[in-house]
């Protein structure tokens, strides 16, 4: 009996190891297939001319490979490193589940909710397309996304439920810095969402006062830029100062830093004031309309002093 018990335990251990090897192998194959398909689609963009491309993708051959990983109901986007560049809940592909990405929608607290579908949104940095899909699918906004890496666009279309371009959705394969400086976009954007990082996700890749000044010029009179700041606190403080120099410090509101290390900053084209009761009513109205935890935002959002 002792030998049989030991044999059973050994067999369980062997089968556990086999299952683990099987899962890891399946994940590796899925990631490899994702890279292959994304590269193939990216080549199609470059060879045939991508309809949404307003600027050339310079040095695209040096951009990182794009892959994905699945765990349960979650799918994660990677740029060839362990750093997560975005994610999607497979059962709710058009919702936003990451806390810091939800906070990128904080501009809704200051918007006329009855007019949101008539506004224009722009995302600089596509990631897993969470913001782009939410603005397009849930809010019905005119939505433009700017992404440097054509493999990211291909992967989002293949694995992250990003719709094809249509009358209210455009994905531009190009440089966000160039787009920000283009005259055609000035004064047109109501909600500008900036989340730009490289494959290591250590700090924003575009973080100059000049870039933020160009971003300000894109906004309508009541427009708002939300930007994801991450990295060391000293670096975040420097970024806030650059944005303050470009926008004016009295236009800035900030969320407290998330546990994951993300600080979401709101920068308005012009200063905004709102009393606590009005913000609470607005947050409750947002929650009724859309799957966003807006009431929780009020506990961690305040003007920058």
Label every model-predicted segment.
Residues 1-17:
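Short, strongly hydrophobic alpha-helical membrane anchors
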Residues 24-38:
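N-terminal signal-anchor transmembrane alpha helix of single-pass membrane proteins
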Residues 38, 43-70, 84-91, 99, ...:
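SAM/dcSAM-binding transferase cores
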Residues 59, 77, 94-221, 234:
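The AdoMet/dcAdoMet-binding core of the Class I SAM-like
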Residues 80-87, 192:
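Short, basic/glycine-rich phosphate-binding loops at helix/coil junctions
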Residues 83-86, 197-200, 225:
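A short, flexible beta-alpha/helix-coil linker loop
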